[in-house]
Structures are given as structure tokens and as C-alpha cells.
Amino acid sequence: MDVILLERVEKLGQMGQVVKVKPGFARNFLLPQKKALRATKENLAYFETQKARLEARNLELRKEAEQVAGSMGNVSVVITRQSGETGQLYGSVSSRDIADALAEKQIQVERRQVAIDQPIKTLGLFPVRIVLHPEVFVTITVNVARSADEAELQAQRGGMVTGLREEDEEEEVEETATEEGGEETAA
């Protein structure tokens, strides 16, 4: 089925292009979301008359998305979940969980704007794309941990913390403090 794209669609094409897609994709996604029109003579003529208005609307939406992207900066969200000793979660973190965590930080995004290929099933730090507009996206860091304390440790170390007891953590902190002190005197 041939359709006329009314906005940029990732991995498909730019606004105004006539592209061939599978009928189910057109009927179930592109047409209901008003991202495309069927490529008929009447719709081609309609698109040409409305092209300037559509481009202006697209530009306005893009500017709004860029402002939101600028305000998001380096956002990081913490999601606490129960897990086994190896770091495997007893469930998963989905796009809905990430959208809810962003909503707690007063950032409103829909779950369909959170672009993760597969649900997150382990503890750790994960980069996640938030698609604010077909041409504007922001990458945030999702910190999945067992507790808030563990989330802080993961953020400091830049990775998953597994099986550390409090005594081990204190010893590591003391060791790094002495190493840093030794480097300063040598310099």
C-alpha cells in the first residue's frame, strides 16, 4: 500500500514522501495516528495544498520538543526493584515504569515516547532514548537498583554493584582515600 507521509517517520521516510508499506502497518499505525494518508490522486492534491501548513506545524512542534529536551538536560531516574544475587530482576522495567519515574520528576512523557528495544531485566545503569519529536530525542540514564543506597553507589561507580557487604564498602572507601592521598604527595 502506498501512503503519503505527513511527518517524518523513523526508518521509513521524510514528510511528503510517498512510500510503500505493508497494509497492516498503514491501517493499524500510520493512518490512525495521522502520520500518513493513502496515496490517491485526491490526497496528493490535498497534501500539496496543505504542505505549507503541515511544515509550519511540524516546525512549531519541533521547537517545543527542543525546548523540552533542553530543560531535561542530563536527567537520571532511579527505579528500585527486587532481584536475585546475580542481579537478575524478579520482573522487568518497561517503558511504562520509566515514564512513571519521569512523571515523579515533573517530566511528562508518554510511554510510547520511551524507546527501549527490550525490557530491562538486570540491575545497573542503562541509557534510554526519549523520542520527543520524530527529529528530536534525549538520552537519559535509568538506574535500576535494589535500594536508594545501592542506586547512589551505582551512580558513583558507573555500573552494577553486586554482593558488597557494608564492611567491604567501608574498606574500599578507606583504600581509595589512601591511594588518592599518596598520589597527591607524589605530584
Swiss-Prot record:
InterPro entries: Ribosomal_bL9 (IPR000244), Ribosomal_bL9/RNase_H1_N (IPR009027), Ribosomal_bL9_bac/chp (IPR020594), Ribosomal_bL9_C (IPR020069), Ribosomal_bL9_C_sf (IPR036791), Ribosomal_bL9_N (IPR020070), Ribosomal_bL9_N_sf (IPR036935). Gene3D superfamilies: Ribosomal protein L9, C-terminal domain, Ribosomal protein L9, N-terminal domain. One of its GO terms (molecular function) is structural constituent of ribosome. One of its GO terms (biological process) is translation. Coiled coil: none annotated. The keyword Ribonucleoprotein applies. Residues 155-187 are annotated as: Disordered. Pfam families: Ribosomal_L9_C, Ribosomal_L9_N. Keywords: Ribonucleoprotein, Ribosomal protein, RNA-binding, rRNA-binding. One of its GO terms (cellular component) is ribonucleoprotein complex. Residues 166-187 have a biased composition (Acidic residues). The keyword Ribonucleoprotein applies. Disulfide bonds: none annotated. PANTHER family: 50S RIBOSOMAL PROTEIN L9. Belongs to the bacterial ribosomal protein bL9 family. Binds to the 23S rRNA. HAMAP family: Ribosomal_bL9. This is Large ribosomal subunit protein bL9. It comes from Rhodospirillum centenum (strain ATCC 51521 / SW). The gene is rplI.
